[in-house]
Amino acid sequence: MKNLTPRQAQILKAIINEYIAYAIPVGSKLLTKKYFKNLSGGTLRNEMAALEKKGFLKKNHISSGRVPSQIGYQYYVKVLNVSNTTNDLKTRLRSVILQQHKTIDEVIELGVKFINEIINLPVVLTNFSSDEVLKKIDLIILDKSFALFLLVSASGKVFKKTISYANQRQFEDIVICVRIFNDRIIDTRFSEINNQLEVLKEIIRTKVHEYQYVIDEILFKLFDLDQIEANKKIYGIQYLAKQPEFANQEKLTKILNLLEDTSVWQQMAFINQTNQKTNIVFGDQLGFKEISVASTLINTTSEAKHQLAIVGPTRMDYQKIKALLTTLKEEIEKYDKKIHNQT
């Protein structure tokens, strides 16, 4: 990444702060009036042209002003300086977390809701629980065509799976499978179930009427570990529609699909596991150029991991978001150690 002079860095930061706040291309006139009263408009235009030439800014087609490029945002993220406003938010977040004694999951949810209300962007909370142990499988008949499987873990988490059936023979196969599962894989870690499925298939083959139906509709869907391992909640999804970048229905639909894509959050978890801090991933790495994702992984004394990810337009307030996520990670891990030492 090319170096900037101190003045160019300050001009870039001012432009990005303005664009984050108002989503309007920034011109030299505004910069002179609001940020650099000691600089002439000509000097600012020259510096902005230099920033554009270096790839940090780009021109807007419908305005004479400039907007940040992805290179500009990446530089901005690397040279963040925490402001007094951000310090105040961090203090408020700490008070929310520590205001009363709660479980780790409850404290995380309190922190997520606080961040969600402050930044007005969706927050994705993903709990990775591949080390959960299966304790029970229950079956609930919904109607003549659908049944609901309830997979209950040792920690009390319940994973729900809806299975369809077309006739009495398929329904009988569902009942047979539940009996076999409860006999054979109870007290097994979810991450180890797939290793036992090959043995189960041979047992099931001799018991059921429609073996291929069982494979496709029950085994494939019931033990989809991507869904079980990544238990996901999305907070504040309504804020997306308020962002001008997502006013187009097609773009909004695309980002909503991204939020529901479990593989994306597993990819983010790998990045966070490798680099134990708050990470910023720009949209071109996820196949969607107009977004960014800020995320962090919270490690607790239990083997479950909690990932927080904030999804927004490329112009989102990285300074504030990064500070809040980092603070939440540090405070939750500190709180977890404290309550663990008390037990």
From Swiss-Prot:
GO terms for biological process: negative regulation of DNA-templated transcription. Keywords: Repressor, Stress response, Transcription, Transcription regulation. GO terms for molecular function: DNA binding. The keyword Transcription regulation applies. It comes from the Bacteria. InterPro entries: GAF-like_dom_sf, HrcA, HrcA_C, WH-like_DNA-bd_sf, WH_DNA-bd_sf. Negative regulator of class I heat shock genes (grpE-dnaK-dnaJ and groELS operons). Prevents heat-shock induction of these operons. Belongs to the HrcA family. This is Heat-inducible transcription repressor HrcA. It comes from Mycoplasma genitalium (strain ATCC 33530 / DSM 19775 / NCTC 10195 / G37) (Mycoplasmoides genitalium). The lineage of its organism: Bacteria, Bacillati, Mycoplasmatota, Mycoplasmoidales, Mycoplasmoidaceae. The gene is hrcA.
